[in-house]
A protein has these predicted regions:
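C-terminal domain-boundary segment and adjacent tail
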Residues: 13-23, 102-105, 132-153, 194-234
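Aromatic-lined glycan-binding groove of carbohydrate-active enzymes
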Residues: 138, 180-191
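Catalytic-face loop-and-helix region of soluble metabolic enzyme cores
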Residues: 160-161, 166-174, 190
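Solvent-exposed, polar/charged alpha-helical surfaces in well-ordered, non-transmembrane soluble domains
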Residues: 6, 10, 95, 99, ...
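Active-site-adjacent substrate/metal-binding segments within catalytic domains
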Residues: 1
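Substrate-binding cleft/loops of secretory-pathway carbohydrate-active enzymes
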Residues: 35, 119-162
C-alpha cells in the first residue's frame, strides 16, 4: 500500500479523476446477526481522509464481505460465501456498517452501496430501499454474471439510482475496451472498479507486476480523456 496508494493518487491527480472508496468494516464470516465492532479505525481514517481530501467520496461495501442473500440462495461451488440467517441479521449488519461509517467519518455524507462480489438478492435489495434511506445509489454490474446483481443506468421505482460499473481491473483487454467504447456511444458514461488486492491476484494481473498494471491504467485514462474530453468527472 505504500507504493500502490500514492501511485493511485497520482493517477487521479494527473487525469482529474475522483475516486469512490467503499468500506468493509471487517472480514468476519458471521451471518447470524452476531456483531463484532471494528475498534481499530486508523487505517480507515488514513486512507479515507486522503481520498476525501482529493475530492473523492466514501460509500458502503459491507459489514463483512458476505452478500445480502438469504438461505434460498445456493452459491454451490461458485462463490465461497455463506447466506444470512434471516432478514433481521442482514439488517443488523447493514445498520452496524452505517454506524461505523458515521463514527469513523463524522459529518461525511455516504450514499453509495457496492455489493460484495456484485451479489445482491431481491430480499437484500428491497431491504436497503425500505430500511436505509442513506443508501441512494447501488453500483453493481452492467454485464451479466453468475449470481450478479445486473443493472441498467436508471432511477428505480423506489428512488434508488442504479449506477452499474462497466469495467474493472488493470488488464485492459479487447473486451474491456469494447465495453467501455460501447457505453460511451450508448450513454456517454464510463465507470471502472479496482480492488487494492488486484496486484496480488494472478487472475487479475499480478503476474504483470504493478508497474505494468499502473501503465495500463494510465493508458486507459489517457484514452478516455482523448476519446471523450467533455465527459464530466462526477
Amino acid at each position: 500500500m505504500d507504493v500502490w496508494w500514492p501511485d493511485m493518487q497520482e493517477l487521479a491527480s494527473d487525469h482529474n479523476v475522483r475516486y469512490t472508496g467503499v468500506i468493509i468494516e471487517n472480514y468476519e464470516d458471521a451471518t447470524d446477526g452476531t456483531i463484532k465492532k471494528q475498534k481499530d479505525t486508523r487505517r480507515f481514517q488514513y486512507f479515507g481522509n486522503m481520498l476525501l481530501h482529493q475530492g473523492g467520496e466514501l460509500g458502503y461495501h459491507g459489514y463483512n464481505h458476505q452478500p445480502l442473500s438469504l438461505s434460498n440462495a445456493d452459491y454451490g461451488d461458485v462463490l465461497p460465501y455463506d447466506t444470512w440467517k434471516n432478514e433481521a441479521a442482514m439488517k443488523k449488519a447493514v445498520k452496524e456498517l452505517i454506524h461505523f461509517g458515521e463514527d469513523t467519518f463524522p459529518g461525511v455524507s455516504m450514499s453509495v452501496y457496492v455489493p460484495p462480489s456484485n451479489v445482491l438478492s431481491a430480499e437484500g435489495r428491497k431491504m436497503l430501499a425500505k430500511d436505509f434511506p442513506e443508501i441512494r445509489t447501488i453500483a453493481s454490474n452492467y454485464f451479466t454474471g453468475e449470481f450478479a446483481y445486473v443493472q441498467e443506468f436508471e432511477v428505480a421505482k423506489d428512488g434508488i439510482v442504479e449506477q452499474p460499473r462497466i469495467i474493472s481491473g488493470a488488464i485492459i483487454d479487447n473486451y474491456m475496451k469494447m465495453a467501455a467504447l460501447s457505453e460511451l456511444n450508448m450513454h456517454f458514461v464510463n465507470s471502472h472498479f479496482i480492488h487494492p488486492d488486484d496486484l496480488l491476484d494472478e487472475d487479475r494481473g499480478a503476474a504483470l507486476g504493478w508497474e505494468k498494471m499502473k501503465g495500463n491504467l494510465a493508458d486507459y485514462m489517457d484514452w478516455l480523456v482523448d476519446s471523450a474530453p467533455s465527459l464530466r468527472q462526477l
